Curated annotation (Swiss-Prot):
Protein name listed in UniProt: Extracellular metalloprotease VDBG_01143
Pfam families according to UniProt: Peptidase_M43
GO CC field: extracellular region
Coiled-coil intervals, chain numbering: none
Residues annotated as binding Zn(2+): H200, H204
UniProt keyword terms in alphabetical order: Disulfide bond, Glycoprotein, Hydrolase, Metal-binding, Metalloprotease, Protease, Secreted, Signal, Zinc
GO molecular function, one term: metal ion binding
Disulfide bonds: C236-C263
Species of provenance: Verticillium alfalfae (strain VaMs.102 / ATCC MYA-4576 / FGSC 10136) (Verticillium wilt of alfalfa)
Keyword check for DNA-binding: no
InterPro entries noted in UniProt: MetalloPept_cat_dom_sf, Peptidase_M43
Cellular location(s): Secreted
Any GO BP annotation: proteolysis
Glycan attachment positions: N58
Native organism taxonomy: Eukaryota, Fungi, Dikarya, Ascomycota, Pezizomycotina
Length: 284
């Protein structure tokens, strides 16, 4: 089962002239797979550890997480309309990641950019073959792929950090983040062209779940300071309270909801701690 929107509008076709047509408004859709039982179990273990550290008051200075980014532009042709991003679009996306994650001591450095014209890969066909050909670096390096369209009409998807990611394994090869090229800053995806799809998916890559994970019952996204949420948000519904029996309004400004890019603002302190816990456990 995939984390994805149940209500996805059809995208407007891009003209063959190379002009970047504005895509029709739609609901955010994330294609990241549900976390495995192992991953949820580890989230619970880390949550307990984080709570003990907070209770003890034994808070030590932590190092900044420095992430090398290998940016893979995968296009259907050598036009922006077909996914061939400019250098500025690439660096602007990295700048968004740095701005959004800086308060949480995570920094991104563009280690390299490559461009590939392959119609099938640009439309998310044969993911493993594409990544086997393009992937670079180690398990702590972020491989970020931009493509023209993704499976199930998602705007992006990512792979959670996990055990067993030995060099050359399928887990290692497929690791990374894929986003629609139209979602980078200056892209054509209406409502989602400020680069925040990248932030959302990198959040998954660092171990975070959707804020609406689990709905109004149970332990939800396994982070104690994100209010319970019955379902994903759409747009920027100020004051939404989909779990009235639980404390707090829906976290519509949280990067791990499905709000419009202009609505996104934050990660919580609990998500901040979880990012660092998962990094230390699996990627450091």
């Amino acid at each position: 089962m995939l984390f994805k929107s149940l209500f996805v509008a059809a995208a407007t076709a891009v003209g063959v002239s190379g002009h970047v047509a504005r895509e029709a408004p739609r609901t955010f859709g994330c294609g990241t797979h549900e976390p495995s039982a192992e991953h949820v179990g580890m989230s619970k273990v880390l949550a307990a550890q984080e709570a003990r550290v907070l209770e003890s008051g034994n808070l030590t200075a932590r190092a900044t997480i420095n992430v090398n980014v290998y940016f893979h532009v995968v296009a259907a042709s050598q036009t922006v309309a077909n996914g061939y991003l400019t250098d500025k679009m690439v660096t602007d996306q990295i700048a968004v990641l740095n701005r959004d994650f800086a308060p949480h001591d995570v920094a991104f450095r563009l280690a390299g950019t490559d461009r590939t014209v392959n119609t099938g890969w640009a439309r998310d066909s044969n993911e493993i073959a594409m990544k086997r050909a393009l992937r670079k670096g180690t398990y702590k390096d972020l491989n970020l792929y931009t493509q023209v369209s993704l499976t199930d009409n998602a705007l992006g998807y990512a792979y959670f950090p996990t055990s067993g990611a030995t060099s050359g394994s399928t887990t290692f090869i497929r690791d990374g983040v894929s986003i629609k090229a139209q979602t980078v800053p200056g892209g054509s995806q209406a409502g989602f062209n400020l680069g925040k799809t990248g932030t959302h998916e990198v959040g998954h890559w660092l171990g975070l779940y959707h804020t609406f994970q689990g709905g109004c019952t149970g332990s939800g996204d396994q982070v104690s300071d994100t209010p319970a949420q019955a379902s994903f948000s759409s747009g920027c519904p100020i004051g939404r309270d989909s779990c009235p029996g639980q404390a707090g309004l829906d976290p519509i400004h949280n990067y791990m909801d499905y709000s419009d890019d202009s609505c996104y603002e934050e990660f919580t302190p609990g998500q901040d701690a979880r990012i660092h816990s998962f990094w230390t456990t699996y990627r450091a």
